[in-house]
Curated annotation (Swiss-Prot):
GO terms for molecular function: rRNA binding; structural constituent of ribosome. Coiled coil: none annotated. Keywords: Ribonucleoprotein, Ribosomal protein. The lineage of its organism: Eukaryota, Sar, Alveolata, Ciliophora, Intramacronucleata. Belongs to the universal ribosomal protein uL6 family. It comes from Tetrahymena thermophila (strain SB210). It comes from the Eukaryota. This is Large ribosomal subunit protein uL6. The keyword Ribosomal protein applies.
């Protein structure tokens, strides 16, 4: 069944400005700017008032309405990112061979050494806007911080996938780097 008009309103908080032009949404806030294109969807993105963004789709099927809700959620995540930011923590888990990590001084990349006793060095470059850090008082913990939820979580996935156990029983070999905590950066 097709609905004639489906509409979703996204409220804009104070200190945040949003510009929408030709399905490209740019969100500016106190922590930075995020720009994302939604050209793949036939959605009308309008800003009728200063505190509201209106998303509309005409003659939409169920899947197209789901895309509309996904775009609304992404815009809400962008607003939350430029106001509060995102912070993910990753734990280094090992049984016998301790994993050694070296974070670049600017936090843009990480080197992982001695995973399962291998001599190979794994280098992972962080996506734009993501800062990797390690505190000495928190042993075997990495912290990834940024304003774009997609980039922060994708960088976590790249780090996790670089340390997967291959050709062994994963129930026995639990070594790796895993996400242990996801939160907003301001909530500490």
């Amino acid at each position: 069944m097709r609905h004639l008009l489906t509409e979703v309103n996204v409220p804009i908080p104070d200190k945040v400005t949003i510009t929408a032009k030709q399905r490209v949404v740019e969100v500016k806030g106190p922590l930075g700017t995020i720009k994302r294109a939604f050209r793949y969807a036939s959605v009308d993105i309008q800003k009728p008032t200063a505190d509201n963004v209106k998303l509309q789709i005409w003659q939409a099927s169920r899947k197209e309405r789901a895309v509309l809700q996904s775009i609304a959620s992404q815009i809400k995540n962008m607003i939350r990112g430029v106001t509060e930011g995102y912070k993910f923590k990753m734990k280094l888990a090992f049984a016998h061979f301790p994993i050694q990590e070296a974070v670049a001084k600017d936090g843009s990349s990480i080197e992982i050494k001695h995973f399962l006793g291998e001599k190979r060095i794994r280098r992972i470059q962080a996506l734009p806007g993501v800062k990797i850090s390690r505190k000495d008082e928190e042993k075997n913990t990495l912290t990834l911080q940024g304003i774009d939820l997609n980039n922060v979580s994708q960088t976590c996935a790249l780090i996790h996938q670089s340390c997967l156990v291959k050709e062994k029983d994963i129930r026995q070999f639990l070594d790796g780097i895993y996400v242990s905590d996801k939160r907003l950066a301001m909530n500490e």
